[in-house]
Amino acid sequence: MEPLQSNFHGSSEETTASVVAALTALHAANGGGDAMDSAAFATALDASDPLRDFRARFAIPQHGDEDGVYLCGNSLGLLPHDTRDVVQGQLDKWARGGVKGHFEEPLPWARCEEALPELMAEIVGCSPECVETEIAVANSLSVNLHLLMAAFYRPTAERNVILIEAAAFPSDRYAVTSQIVHHGFDPATSLVEVKSPATANLMDGGIIPTETIIAAIDANKDRLSLVLFSGLQYLSGQYFDIPTVTAHVHAINAAAPAGTPPIIIGWDLAHAAGNVPMHLHDWNVDFATWCSYKYLNSGAGCLSGFFVHERHATAYEKHPRLAGWWGVKFEKRFKMEHKVRALLLLSPRLVFLPLRTAHSSPPSLSPTPRRWTSPPAQLVSFAPTSRRCWSRA
C-alpha cells in the first residue's frame, strides 16, 4: 500500500479534505469491505503499512496487558531497543580505560558527533556536498537559537523588530524577548506577533494563512531584522509554508536599496524534524534549529541540530559568531593553541569548521550515542524511511 499523501501547506479545511481523500482511496484500494471507522479497517491498514516493521524496534508503553497507542511523540519519542546496549558499552569503556575512551573504538568520544550531520542532512533537506558547511549537531535547541541570533540578529535603531507567530512555543518567546532586551530594545515595540484570524484564544493555536504572514512581513518590512517562525505549529499542527515565506523575505531583500540590512529568516523545526519533509538548502532558508528527542527519538534533553545556509558559512565579518573548542578542526583541537582569534580572522576555514563551533565536547554518555552506531539505530534508519515516505511530498 502506498504511503498516505496529503496537502501539508493548505488551510485546515484543505488539509482535512486531502487526508479524507487519501483515506478514501486507501479504503477503496483495500477492497472497501470494512467501514472506514472500523477496527478491522485500521488493522488492515497496519498490516499493509510499508513501515510496519519499525514499530518492533521501539519499547512501547503498556496499557493494561497490551501495547499502548503512543501519541506523545510531539513531547518525547520512544526508546529504541538498542539504546541500552549502546550506552552500557560506553559505560564499560569508561570503566575499562578512563580517558582512553576519547580515542577508543567504537564511538571514540572525541569524534562521536561527526557522523550526525550527514544523518541529519536528508531529514532536513541538505545536499551531501553541503553537509560540512550547513549542518551541525550540538547543545540544546534554546542554546542554539541564542547562538544563531547572536550571529544573525543585528538590530539597529531603525531595524530591530522580530516577527513571530502569536502562539509560538514559550521557549522561543523567552529567547527572542531576552535577545531584544539584551540589545537594549523594548519587546513592546520590537516584538511583533502574527495572529490567526480564526480565533482570539491564543491557546487555540488556529491556522495562520500564508497570506496573513506575508502581509505582516510587508507591513513591518522597514523595521524588521528577523522573522522567526515554527516550521510546524505545536498547538494547531499547521505546517507553515516555509519555501513561500522564505522566498518572500528574500524578494524584499533583493528589492531593497543597496546597503539596506537584510531581513533574516529563521525557523524553529522542533516539531518538524523527523515529522514532515523539508528541503532547507533548496528553500534558501537562512538558519534553522531543531531538537532530537521528539520525532527523532534520542531521549529527553539530547542534542539539538542546526542549519545555516552555505552562503553564510564564511561570512564572519557580516555575521560574527560565538565560538568554542569543538569548532576547531580535529587535527588542531588538542594542540591547545592560543592564537585562535588572529588565525580565525586571517583564515577561518583553516582553523574553524564553518559551523561546528559548539562550546565544548558533546555528552557521549547520554542516550544520543546510539544514533552514532551501526543500524538499526533510529537516526540511521530515518534515511531510508524518509526516502520511502517523502519521495513524492
Protein language model features and the residues they cover:
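Pyridoxal 5′-phosphate
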Residues: 2-393
